[in-house]
């Protein structure tokens, strides 16, 4: 209790009844300031803040063709997190493994910073998961783990965010801005964005 996740649990309690869980947003309509979810339900708003990957929308209505094509050029990496129930004898919290012979590239040793934890977690790029000889006890594939920087990404995002913000749709955070932010930075950005759009 009172760990990092406690912040999000308390925030969720404050906005209970105003959040819909368990469904994907599949369409963003810039013309009518609304979203459509996978279950077919629409939600409208005066202002929309999007924090999901732009290229995860099945369709963005009202976006010019050149920006549609640009969004398709945004790149990301996918990471599998795999649990191993053994104990690693190390004082490290993270180990980085730059070894092409191993499928994983990073190990998270939770028991060194989270009391009562057992085992450790392997992080593996999606393209290397097949290198494991056996099935994992538990694993999770995060399709959108990290946004990747490409030569044209800054220009794409500048044009995209300028266009959508003129229509009261704001990209925020790691995926809304397609930038590798950690959550503490995003909380600060969210507070600043809320102050800005509340005074528009």
Predicted regions and their residues:
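Short loop/edge segments at beta-strand edges and connector loops
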Residues: 19-23, 29, 173
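Mid-domain catalytic core of redox enzymes
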Residues: 26-33, 37-145, 156-163
């Amino acid at each position: 209790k009172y760990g990092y996740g406690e912040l999000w649990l308390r925030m969720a309690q404050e906005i209970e009844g105003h959040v819909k869980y368990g469904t994907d947003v599949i369409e963003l309509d810039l013309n009518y300031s609304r979203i459509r979810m996978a279950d077919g339900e629409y939600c409208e708003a005066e202002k929309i803040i999007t924090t999901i990957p732009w290229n995860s929308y099945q369709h963005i209505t009202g976006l010019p063709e050149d920006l549609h094509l640009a969004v398709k050029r945004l790149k990301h990496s996918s990471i599998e997190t795999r649990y191993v129930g053994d104990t690693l004898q190390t004082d490290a919290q993270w180990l980085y493994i730059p070894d092409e012979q191993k499928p994983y590239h990073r190990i998270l040793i939770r028991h060194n910073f989270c009391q009562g934890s057992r085992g450790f977690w392997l992080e593996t790029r999606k393209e290397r998961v097949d290198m494991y000889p056996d099935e994992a006890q538990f694993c999770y594939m995060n399709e959108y783990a990290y946004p990747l920087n490409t030569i044209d990404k800054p220009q794409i995002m500048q044009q995209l965010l300028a266009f959508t913000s003129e229509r009261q749709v704001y990209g925020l955070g790691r995926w809304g801005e397609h930038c590798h932010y950690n959550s503490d930075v995003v909380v600060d950005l969210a507070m600043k964005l809320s102050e800005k759009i509340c005074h528009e």
